[in-house]
Structure formats: C-alpha cells, structure tokens
Amino acid sequence: MKNRFRTKKDSHRQLMKEFFLGFIKIHILYHTGERPFYGQELKEELEKHGYSLSYGTLYPVLHKLCDEGYLRREEKNVEGKIRKYYTLTEQGAHLLGQVKEKIKELVDEVMD
C-alpha cells in the first residue's frame, strides 16, 4: 500500500518546484517581450539564470501561455528547418506589468 502522506522533504521539494515554475514563467514573459525566442533559445536563456529544465517541462509551459493568450507562436523556416518563435502579446505585456508590481511589492517587504 502506497503511503498517502508526504514527508517534509517531499513537501519542500514540491513547493520549491511550484515557486521555480512561477519564476520560469515570469522569465519567459519578460524575455519574449524583448524579442521573439524559439524553444531552444529560451531553454539556454533560462539555464543562464540557473534553471535546469527539460523540453518536456518547457514546451507545455509555452503551449499553455500561448493557449491563454499571453504568448503568440509563429513558425518560421530557418535554413530549411521550421522553428516556432514565441512573442509576448498585449495581454501578456499587461500581465507582466502586474507581475512586476507584485514582485516589487514583495521584494520591498521581504528585503526591508
């Protein structure tokens, strides 16, 4: 019978995963607002910030952000290869603005 109760270590790990996933989404919104990115570029950019994630994690996040209207996906033929570029939408820019306000508020409170 599988243990129904999580250990503190499991709970901690799950909570950290949820935090990092939120941070990753913010990074994606920010960077795609600067210029169009394709998946591999975003993965490399996130790695510069210390996030190690698989394509199996990245692409579902990108697809969800597109489905919710925060990103736009555009296919381009680059040297005979189809690449999907992601760009921040107006709705995504509005959300990012709200997130930035909340981040500033949180940092001001926590770091005071």
Where are these regions (language model features)?
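Extended, well-structured beta-strand/loop surface patches
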Residues: 8-11, 66-71
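Short, aromatic/basic-enriched loop-to-helix "N-cap" motif that marks the start
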Residues: 55, 81-82
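N-terminal helix-turn-helix DNA-binding core of bacterial DNA-binding proteins
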Residues: 15-57
